[in-house]
Regions:
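A short, N-terminal "cap"/entry segment at the start of jelly-roll beta-barrel domains
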Residues: 3, 7-62, 143-150
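Short, conserved beta-strand element in jelly-roll/cupin
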Residues: 69-70, 81-97
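Aromatic/pi-system hotspot detector in well-structured domains
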Residues: 63-66, 82, 111, 132
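Histidine-centered metal-chelating micro-motifs
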Residues: 75-77, 96, 112, 116-122
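Ligand-binding loop in jelly-roll beta-barrel domains
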Residues: 60, 116-141
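Conserved short histidine dyad/triad with adjacent acidic residue
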Residues: 51, 66-81
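Short acidic-glycine-tyrosine-enriched beta hairpin
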Residues: 102-116
Length: 150
């Protein structure tokens, strides 16, 4: 095979690869029920996490939901920011959350919204495990980038 034939073969492979990639539909989650008993509780150094889903929907590039259990006196990570917006619903325990530069203490039933690229943090300041539901959303308007600590 000479250089011209090699180049033509590589170009054809690239075109076919692109066409196949574009033809692969992204599975979009429709209405769904998640049975609590079917969610695996995975222990970690801070407590545990149950992953509910991380998938595209009809209107979101990604919907990520998990439920975390956080041991008393523990923070899952240092204050940080990320492009996606995040909603946290406290089910059990007392936590402090960093919001708009201020640490605020909240308990069961409280709802925390962390805006895109806004510095936020979280720690369990109670004497029992804190359990909370986290909903992260990514849309076409979500800025590019990843998590930045500090």
């Amino acid at each position: 095979m000479n250089r011209r034939e090699l180049f033509a073969a590589l170009a054809a492979t690239a075109v076919v690869g692109d066409a196949l990639a574009m033809a692969q539909p992204t599975t979009v989650m429709g209405s769904h029920v998640f049975d609590w008993n079917s969610l695996t509780d995975v222990p970690n150094q801070h407590g545990s996490t149950r992953t509910v889903c991380s998938t595209p929907t009809a209107t979101l590039e990604n919907l990520e939901i998990h439920v975390s259990t956080l041991k008393p006196g523990v923070s899952p990570h240092p204050p940080h920011r990320h492009p996606n917006e995040e909603l946290i619903i406290i089910r059990q325990g007392t936590v402090e959350t960093l919001s708009n530069g201020t640490w605020i203490r909240v308990g069961p039933g409280s709802i925390i919204f962390n805006g895109s690229n806004q510095l936020h943090g979280f720690k369990n300041v109670g004497t029992e495990n804190a359990i909370y539901h986290v909903v992260n959303v990514k849309t076409e308007k979500t800025p590019a980038g990843g998590t930045v600590f500090g």
